[in-house]
A protein has these predicted regions:
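A short acidic, often aromatic-flanked loop/helix-cap motif at beta-alpha or helix-coil junctions
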Residues: 10, 39-40, 94-99
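Short aromatic-enriched loop/helix-cap "lid" or pocket-rim segments at secondary-structure transitions
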Residues: 13-17, 75-77, 101-103
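Residue-level signal for the nucleotide or nucleotide-sugar donor/cofactor binding architecture
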Residues: 38-41, 70, 112
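Amphipathic terminal alpha-helices
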Residues: 112-142
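Mid/C-terminal beta-alpha module of Rossmann-like enzyme folds, strongest
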Residues: 47-99, 129-141
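NAD(P)-dependent short-chain dehydrogenase/reductase
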Residues: 1-38, 44-45
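Hydrophobic/aromatic beta-strand patches that form the interior of the parallel beta-sheet core
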Residues: 1-3, 62, 112
Length: 142
């Protein structure tokens, strides 16, 4: 089985390189590209998919996505909303690239909406603060 996707989520290393890590370390404002489209899953959602395919084996190439693209501006807005960030996200209409991923119909697992994935991720992080507190500004119930 090959799972093809793109992931976003917290990193355990201090000098993380991903979009979530980058956003969580911004101080005042950042750019949000309205024409750059992403279509993956959170790291937590990928773990759920891996657990699912272990229990429900399939073979071949499976693309893991909810089948909907989201632009980076809206993605950062979800981070801001769910993690209660005061960062100003400035919309930018350039850098048009579509990295959305079509959902494989063979995978019976239903990937939720982006908002739900990030709500779930926030709850997971809040429940496992000791894993993330060193690298991310976190408060219980925030």
């Amino acid at each position: 089985l090959t799972l093809r996707t793109s992931i976003v989520g917290p990193e355990l290393k201090a000098n993380g390189e991903g979009l979530f890590h980058w956003f969580m370390h911004q101080e005042k404002q950042c750019l949000g590209y309205k024409t750059a489209i992403w279509g993956g899953v959170t790291t937590l959602e990928l773990a759920k998919v891996v657990d699912y395919v272990i229990q429900n084996p399939i073979t071949g190439l499976v693309q893991v996505s909810n089948g909907e693209g989201i632009n980076k501006f809206d993605l950062l807005q979800l981070f801001k909303e769910i993690w209660h960030s005061g960062i100003e996200i400035v919309p930018v209409d350039k850098n048009g690239i579509d990295k959305s991923i079509a959902r494989s119909q063979r995978l019976a697992y239903e990937v939720p909406s982006y908002k739900q994935m990030f709500i779930d991720l926030k709850q997971w992080m809040d429940g496992h603060i000791s894993l993330y507190a060193a690298n991310y500004p976190m408060e219980q119930g925030r």
